[in-house]
Amino acid sequence: MSLSNSLGLLGRKVGMMRLFTDDGDAVPVTVVDVSNNRVTQIKSQETDGYVALQVTFGSRKASRVTKPQAGHLAKAGVEAGEIIREFRVTADTAGQHKAGAVIAASSVFSVGQKVDVQGTSIGKGYAGTIKRHNMSSQRASHGNSRSHNVPGSIGMAQDPGRVFPGKRMTGHLGDVTKTTQNLDVFRIDEARQLLLIKGAIPGSKGGFVTVRPAIKAKPQAAEGAK
């Protein structure tokens, strides 16, 4: 799937559960609410230099929206949302949508399709190198004093005489944008506009996520091919 034709949906992580296949196998799935994705703007090559669909999700009080954004949304005739994102698409895909229209889950995804899910990972505060970078602790005894769970020496010799940027050290863990790739769409609840995605996705319950067709999905082999 090319990035130039990857229309996706915005959603909210509801939580995890498990479903059963016809064979009785338990499958862990993440429930994502993708209801009421509204098109706020259709960007074209002539006016914007690229083709994209601007989509909003959720709802926000009118008093919490800036005047420029309120005017932008009023032009499209849509209710203010909590987040706005753009999806680069082809001109044909953009021509199939209109500003103010609602995008249904089944019109973008299908059962068994590979998707990439992007979200903000759970923030865990200030963490040490063992938890943050999976480093090993030092010896518990035999000459080690008060240096059990520390990274050890981080410096260099007199030359270069400094700590290189990017050195793995203690610091804030989590609360960063993460993408989980090549997950399967296990089921689509069209009545409630829910995506049931096999496996775990980044973020905590209630967090916003972006679901796109997988860009590294391997092509499906034709039936009967060896």
Swiss-Prot record:
Residues 135-150 have a biased composition (Polar residues). Residues 135-158 are annotated as: Disordered. The modification N5-methylglutamine is found at Q158. One of its GO terms (biological process) is translation. GO terms for cellular component: cytosolic large ribosomal subunit. It comes from the Bacteria. Keywords: Methylation, Ribonucleoprotein, Ribosomal protein, RNA-binding, rRNA-binding. Gene3D superfamilies: 3.30.160.810, Translation factors. InterPro entries: Ribosomal_uL3, Ribosomal_uL3_bac/org-type, Ribosomal_uL3_CS, Transl_B-barrel_sf. GO terms for molecular function: rRNA binding; structural constituent of ribosome. Methylated by PrmB. Pfam families: Ribosomal_L3. Part of the 50S ribosomal subunit. Forms a cluster with proteins L14 and L19. Belongs to the universal ribosomal protein uL3 family. One of the primary rRNA binding proteins, it binds directly near the 3'-end of the 23S rRNA, where it nucleates assembly of the 50S subunit. This is Large ribosomal subunit protein uL3. It comes from Variovorax paradoxus (strain S110).
